[in-house]
């Protein structure tokens, strides 16, 4: 009997009250775990994100001989082994689709005295890693591709123009190299800033320009305690929901190191109002379109911006979002396709122009095993459209792939049920339980946030 994907009806919200404390950022979480492992001493990390990416990094570090206590309620203790204290793993390290684990680990393992094979799920094998590998090879590392040239999986035997993780990996492993590392042509500079700011481990860095960084060779002393700031990308979904009025969203201040913390300014241009030192947005009416923007520095929040623009009056065009093509899915194609299916007018090209959704009261959105897609396409329910997320099952080629979608912010369920007093708590609990159950073909239903239930309209979600 074929596996039946359930639907989860969410009731509309007329009043929303509560206080949100954001979970940690995915990129900062994994950078901090790796730096803690390579440090000398014990590092207590607080504010850690509970996600598939973080679990991939934690499992890999444990296989490499690092003792880690937790995580428990966003807190874990990492017993650092030093730059050369990692041990040969018992087998290949499977990292799923966690680019924030694959690239930094590739660099950190390049000068270890043992061979390591890094593998991932099918999507990982489509995400290029050749720039990092080329840079490491120039520094003397011996790395072999096991399948397609330039892509994982790879065996390590011992910059950042497409994805910031390329330079991130080099920045992290720089102390193990004999020379300073320089890289240019950055497309995601805010993510580079994250790495530079997550170095209270005693590593001096200099940001000469937006094109050149230099990191001096030195050891990593542990900072003892490392508190991670909240995830600005996760905040963007709540901030974009017109039905969530005056709900404080804390964990990210005005001086956040994350590029996506720019998102409230974009919303102000569209008619929202922010106040206070934390990210609090109080919509003062229907969102309206704003001027064009270069969204390359906020590739994740740009997805939320594009979806919100499709619900606004007029059109908006987030431009130069090149990094979308090499994320968890080809997000440029996915966003264009799904916005078009929802009734928006999509202009082909490197940019994306969203126009108000029209003419449909119900539509299906494919999340393509990408949690960011699932989060974004819950927003159209604010416009009176019931949305059903089919996960991967509608297309045979997708159904044959075994891959989890629930990767980034599972804490959103706790926010919806507890912090915001969600009237659809029962449905969300059922959905959260379903997320942990593997379907017949190994697929897991996509993570769907509370946003579809906001304001006057209900969203119906399902596998």
Swiss-Prot record:
Residues at the active site: 300 (proton acceptor)
Catalytic activity: 3-phosphoshikimate + phosphoenolpyruvate = 5-O-(1-carboxyvinyl)-3-phosphoshikimate + phosphate
Keywords: Amino-acid biosynthesis, Aromatic amino acid biosynthesis, Cytoplasm, Transferase
GO biological process, one term: chorismate biosynthetic process
EC supergroup of this enzyme: transferase
Main location: cytoplasm
Keyword match GTP-binding: no
Keyword Acetylation (UniProt): no
A GO CC annotation given for this chain: cytoplasm
MF terms (GO), sorted A to Z: 3-phosphoshikimate 1-carboxyvinyltransferase activity
EC number: 2.5.1.19
Pathway as given in its UniProt record: Metabolic intermediate biosynthesis; chorismate biosynthesis; chorismate from D-erythrose 4-phosphate and phosphoenolpyruvate: step 6/7
Subunit field text: Monomer.
Family according to the record: Belongs to the EPSP synthase family.
Function as written in the Swiss-Prot or TrEMBL entry: Catalyzes the transfer of the enolpyruvyl moiety of phosphoenolpyruvate (PEP) to the 5-hydroxyl of shikimate-3-phosphate (S3P) to produce enolpyruvyl shikimate-3-phosphate and inorganic phosphate.
Protein name per Swiss-Prot or TrEMBL: 3-phosphoshikimate 1-carboxyvinyltransferase
Lineage start: Bacteria, Pseudomonadati, Pseudomonadota, Betaproteobacteria, Burkholderiales
């Amino acid at each position: 009997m074929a596996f039946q994907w359930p639907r989860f009806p969410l009731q509309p919200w007329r009043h929303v009250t509560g206080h949100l404390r954001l979970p940690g950022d995915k990129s900062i979480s994994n950078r901090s775990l790796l730096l803690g492992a390579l440090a000398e001493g014990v590092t207590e990390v607080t504010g850690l994100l509970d996600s598939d990416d973080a679990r991939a990094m934690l499992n890999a570090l444990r296989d490499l001989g690092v003792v880690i206590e937790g995580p428990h309620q966003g807190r874990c203790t990492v017993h650092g082994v030093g730059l050369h204290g990692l041990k040969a793993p018992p087998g290949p390290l499977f990292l799923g689709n966690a680019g924030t684990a694959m690239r930094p680990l590739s660099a950190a393992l390049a000068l270890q005295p043992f061979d390591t094979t890094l593998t991932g799920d099918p999507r990982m094998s489509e995400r290029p890693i050749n720039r990092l590998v080329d840079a490491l090879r120039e520094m003397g590392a011996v790395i072999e591709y096991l399948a397609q040239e330039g892509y994982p999986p790879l065996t390590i035997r011992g910059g950042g123009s497409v994805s910031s993780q390329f330079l991130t990996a080099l920045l992290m492993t720089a102390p193990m190299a004999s020379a300073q590392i320089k890289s240019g042509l950055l497309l995601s500079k805010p993510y580079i800033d994250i790495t530079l700011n997550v170095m209270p481990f005693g590593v001096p860095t200099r940001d000469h320009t937006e094109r050149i960084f230099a990191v001096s060779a030195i050891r990593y002393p542990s900072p003892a305690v490392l508190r991670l700031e909240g995830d600005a990308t996760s905040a963007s979904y709540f901030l974009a929901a017109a039905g969530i009025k005056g709900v404080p969203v804390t964990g990210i201040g005005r001086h956040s190191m994350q590029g996506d913390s720019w998102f409230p300014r974009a919303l102000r241009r569209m008619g929202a109002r922010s106040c206070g030192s934390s990210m609090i947005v109080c919509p003062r009416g229907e969102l309206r379109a704003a001027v064009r923007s270069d969204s390359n520095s906020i590739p994740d929040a740009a997805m939320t911006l594009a979806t919100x623009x499709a619900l606004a009056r007029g059109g908006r065009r987030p431009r130069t979002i090149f990094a979308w093509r090499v994320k968890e899915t080809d997000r440029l194609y996915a966003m264009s396709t799904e916005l078009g299916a929802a009734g928006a007018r999509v202009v082909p090209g490197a940019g994306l122009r969203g126009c108000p959704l029209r003419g449909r009261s119900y539509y299906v959105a494919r999340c393509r095993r990408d949690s960011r897609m699932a989060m974004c396409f819950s927003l159209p329910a604010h416009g009176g459209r019931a949305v059903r997320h089919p996960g991967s099952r509608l297309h045979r080629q997708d159904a044959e792939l075994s891959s989890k979608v629930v990767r980034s912010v599972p804490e959103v369920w706790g926010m919806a049920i507890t912090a915001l007093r969600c009237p659809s708590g029962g449905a969300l609990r059922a959905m959260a339980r379903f997320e942990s159950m593997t379907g017949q073909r190994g697929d897991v239903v996509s993570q769907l946030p509370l946003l579809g239930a906001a304001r006057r309209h209900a969203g119906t979600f399902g596998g």
